[in-house]
Amino acid sequence: MDEYDKKRRLEHGGSDRSRSSNDNRNSHGSSGNNYRDDRKDDRYYRDDRSHYNNNNNNNNNNNNNNNNNNGNGYRDDRNYSSQNKYQNHHQQSPPQQQQQQQNSSYVPSQPPQQQTQTQQQPHIQAPPPAKPRKSRFDQAPETIPIQAPQQPPMISNQPIFKQQPMYQQPMYQQKQQQPQPPIFQQQQKQQQPPIFQHHQPPPIYQQPPVYQQQQQQQQPVFQQQQQQRVATEAIQFQQTPQQLAIEQERLKQERENEKKIEQANLEEEMKKRREKVEQWRKQKLEQELKASGSSNSGSTSSPPTTTTTTTKTTAATTTATTSPLTIPSQQQQTATTSPIKKKWSLEEEEETAQPLVNTNIEQKEIKLPPTANIPAAAATTTSATINTTTIKQSIEEDDDIDPLDAYMENLNKEANLNLKKSKTSQMIDDDEKLEEESEGEDDGKDKTIKKGKKEMLHTDHTSIKYAEFQKNFYIEVPVLANMTETEVLDFRSELGVKITGKDCPKPIQSWAQAGLTEKVHLLLKKFQYEKPTSIQAQTIPAIMNGRDLIGIARTGSGKTLAFLLPMFRHILAQPKSAPGEGMIALIMSPTRELALQIHVECKKFSKVLGLRTACVYGGASISEQIAELKRGADIVVCTPGRMIDILCANNRRITNLRRVTFLVLDEADRMFDMGFGPQINCIVDSIRPDRQTIMFSATFPPKVENVAKKILNKPLEIIAGGRSIVSSDIEQFVEVRPTETRFRRLIELLSIWYHKGQILIFTNRQETTDNLYRQLSNSQYQCLSLHGSKDQTDRDETISDFKNKVKTILIATPLASRGLDIKDLNLVVNFDCPDHLEDYVHRVGRTGRAGNRGTAYTFITPDEERFSSSIIKALEQSGSKVPDELRKLNDTYEKKRKEGKDVLLAPTGFTGRGHKFDAAEEDKKNIERKQQRKAYGIEEEEEEEDEDKEKAEKEKLAAASAEKEKQLLSEKEKLDPATTNTIVIPGVDGTIITPSSLLQTDPSVPVGQQAINQIFGISQVTSSEEAIKKLQLAAQLGMKGNIQKLNNQITPLNQTHFIEELEINDYSQQARWKVTHKDALLEITNFTNTTITTKGTFFPPNKIPAPGERKLYLYIEGPSDASVKNAKSDIKKILDEVQSTHQSTGKYSVF
């Protein structure tokens, strides 16, 4: 701020700015912004503008007519910059200044009290050139005059508040003031505006009396407020930051003290009212006692059969009649009928306590029993007891209507209501809490609850009358109707569509032929869906026609939109669902991430169409999901487990499935494979039978398809591009490399692809995911990790960050292989090789979506050779080149299998029974099969026919061994002519026993072994290789029981022991340990007098024993057949008991 600005501010410290500013409007067209830093100090001048302008309207009228910009009064003297002002007033000569001052209307405003002082001041010298502005509080030059702010003049005889200085004058201003130049005094005297003259406006501009009276009434209050505000600002301006902090603390303490005082006053008020209530109760009790005493005296003098009736008396009455009172009927009704009492409140209570003199006390009629047969003393005692009872009842009634208790009872009711609401919101906890509650001592109770879910969800459709609904909305356009069958077949072959089923509609060529609404067409144009894809062109007409459908298409082909668009048309044709009625469309998905993705895609259209959607999945807050369902939802996207929880919660009062007419199963093959089968059937059975059911997936094995078709009604199967085929837009690379080199190769790929887009890395295990995340983070790569052990919040944030490109690398388990749609995902790396074809197709299908190009790398180690056949099949079906190393790896594996070596079998993929991820799950399945066979009385037969490959291998080995046995037997027949009398053993093909062979025995060989040798044609000169093959044949054919029976039949001839075998290889680890421990078997051996020996080797379920080896079994020997069988049955009981105890159950045991 320069010197002239400070001088102008000090000159106007006590003047009326509004008057001088109106004159300045004539010469200055606009108000500048050069002096905005002065506003904080002078803002208290703004509020009194109306006061001066109203009283001086006549003086300012002419000046306002020529005003170009209606600025505030005090701002108009800021139009010139400090440099222009300095040049106009100081750098020019005095004549030039005078001429310029006369030509312009600019006159510095100054109060009249200061005019005389200004005229007497001498000249001042011209100040030096203006310096650059530094700060608001920079030191000013010494030549600036100092004038204390003075009180403005009284205008229209109205009091004006006394202006106080904004801040104290600094020390540098307390110097000798220099006189002003004479020329400056002269021009001030000549150009003094008439606004400062003390005169009243002309009568024509006189304000109305009423307005003046109102203004005079409002002015003192306004001035007082202004004075307080100015004083506060002046104090704050003078204080330092430390003082301001102290002042704030003081104000805070004052506010706290005020609150304490208010609280103390409130407590004192409540105390007074409580005392009043207690006093009122005491007085009422005294009056009741008096009234009861009078009634008691009356009852003692009355006849035995007389009814004593008490009337309403006042507290002022001191005497009561002792004779019976006769009251008319109307008066009796009035006396016996209690008046309606108004609810008491604290607000209606008066401040001062008043004696309850005229308070009416109601007394009830008391009927005394007849006292003819009762002594006088007894009668007196009876009447006294009745009176006491009456008093107690009256006291209890008074307690019930106690005012303070009534008030507190209302508060308790409100608190209980809020508590009930909070309990309702937390009625059911998350899935994790349900699992924790199911552990420990409540296992039995929780199993009962879970078992009851099936019964709770069971619906008798015959007893429910469902409303009719429309399925068929499709109207074929003339263009499609005129197409011939040949043209339709050509168009379908062009789309790559194959159809199974009857009466399938013709495929559409554009969105206009689909029969969609106008809003949907606009949304499709907005989201840039130009034309239908192959799967959309054929499935949309079929779904709009009301048919059940199985849709199979490649990843990224638009399957989600294929069922969403017909679903919207289906819902809009039905009445809107009211709160509590349930949803109309239900979409189920196997993973939470896919459910969220479908929900987001659905909301793009539902918001415009006016439909309500809800997403129900595990891991999230169940209270929010319940609230959404109670408000009403037309579309619900869910996972099966959480949906069952909500359907069964609160006795099925949250929602129901009665209005569901459109059911969608996305990734349906995975739904029936991941153990969701019982849950899916449980939900589907609760939906009306005439629903429309849609299934979509990129892979659909035939076995799963057979299971899925059970819930469909005459479905159409539409395959676009093939079944379990990788898209041709994806470039696939498979590298055979050791485990140690995989990470180094991954770093090389990241260095190439890191800046090209987003990257997704798949692993098979959660531990591998965490380790790889740690290694990449140490290598300075920003990445994310995703697997099932993470919280749902972390999983949602991970997917969101990856889609929003916060970080461009995601390491995930196969959890992310289903339905995850990332637009800019350019690279997929299978760090761990997929274990079956369908998993490989879904992993690789995360890239190359919606017509974009993608790249996929797969690492396979020599130890994972069993997976090579699935990858080769995927490469051949998609038309990609198969590396030579991969073919060599597969050939080596097939060669080992043919030779019968110890190799691991590759999983067969989705079989409809649950994917076999590890040996533990396979053990569980085998145990269940064994228990089923035992329940049907089948113990020693082969496995079920579902295990086709294993059975085929066994049959091949058996056929080869049988041919060799026949050749050996034919040779022996030629050598031994005594074959007339032969014994054919049932159950063993091609085995005969001749009498001569039984007589040819070796005393060094046990009798049982000799019999076995005779059965299988094994002589002492037989080679060990042939003997091994024959024993292997017997083991594979499952004839161990027949051999044991034969031993038991032959051995008694020589008085030897009996033998039994019990295979325990397929039981759980706990069961195997139990029956092989000496302590557990000691009791059995002592009781049955047998010997039990563990033999064989443990083999995992997916391994076949090599020739000459057997699975783990128990060898039981005993003196009699009964003892051996008893020992075997006891061991089986132990195995079954341990197996049932340690059998692992799933999360949802509905069936």
From Swiss-Prot:
The UniProt entry's GO biological process terms, in alphabetical order, are: mRNA splicing, via spliceosome
Per the annotation, the residue ranges of the short sequence motif Q motif are 509-537
Does the UniProt entry include the keyword Protease?
no
Q: What is its main location?
A: nucleus
- List compositional bias (Acidic residues) regions by residue number: 428-443, 938-948
Q: Cite the Helicase C-terminal domain residue spans from the record.
A: 729-890
- Domain Helicase ATP-binding positions: 540-718
Keyword tRNA processing belongs to the record: no
What keywords would UniProt list here? ATP-binding, Helicase, Hydrolase, mRNA processing, mRNA splicing, Nucleotide-binding, Nucleus
Q: What is known of its domains?
A: The Q motif is unique to and characteristic of the DEAD box family of RNA helicases and controls ATP binding and hydrolysis.
> Subunit structure, per the record?
Component of the 17S U2 SnRNP complex, a ribonucleoprotein complex that contains small nuclear RNA (snRNA) U2 and a number of specific proteins.
Task: Specify the protein name.
Answer: ATP-dependent RNA helicase ddx46
Question: From which organism does this entry originate?
Answer: Dictyostelium discoideum (Social amoeba)
Gene this chain is encoded by: helB1
